[in-house]
Amino acid sequence: MFVSFEGIDGCGKSTQVNLLVNYLEEKGIPYIKVREPGGTHLGEKIRELLITQEMCARSELLLFLASRAQLVESVIKPALKNGKIVIADRFAHSSVAYQGCGRELGPETVKILNDFATDKTYPDIVFYIDVPVNVAMERMKNQHKDRIEKEGKEFWESIRNCYLKMAKENENFVIIDGTRTIEEIHREIVKVFNAYL
């Protein structure tokens, strides 16, 4: 099974990834946790470029896709083949939202490129943790921000709207209200996850 977590920065996604991983550990369920960009030697080098270097939107997208392609071939496909559950802190839907909508490269264009980069390997479940942009921005106000996280409210609204549209169009999306407590969110995620097992 392949599970990804999506949402705008500040939604609490990474916290929930770690809680689900802890749950799998406790249950003795074999898994692998990956993050995007990154998760491989090449991916981590690309991550550093994406976070620190100024670049045009197309370059940004192509770097994300390169990292993703390597992650799928080197880590995700082998893990799935070996019966492990893959837990991804972001995956292909992030590019549709961030580069397709936020950077205005077009969601359909990004979807086509994602198909190529992932060899059409997609999550069985996408937990989309939804929070209003002002809530996410408030949560992040005292954190060090990378190049992308420094974008303005309009950028984040576009991304959130894109995620909500994808959630309506894809049966494997599960919308999670990210304004609730960490524990409430975790309980809902575990309940949905167990229903898929």
From Swiss-Prot:
State one Pfam family annotation: Thymidylate_kin
Give me any GO biological process, just one: dTDP biosynthetic process
What name does the UniProt record give this protein? Thymidylate kinase
Q: Which PANTHER family match?
A: THYMIDYLATE KINASE, UMP-CMP KINASE 2, MITOCHONDRIAL
Native source species: Fervidobacterium nodosum (strain ATCC 35602 / DSM 5306 / Rt17-B1)
Name the family.
Belongs to the thymidylate kinase family.
Q: State the function annotated in the UniProt record.
A: Phosphorylation of dTMP to form dTDP in both de novo and salvage pathways of dTTP synthesis.
User: What reaction(s) does this enzyme catalyze?
Assistant: dTMP + ATP = dTDP + ADP
Output the InterPro entries linked to this UniProt entry. P-loop_NTPase, Thymidylate_kin-like_dom, Thymidylate_kinase
The UniProt annotation places ATP binding at: 7-14
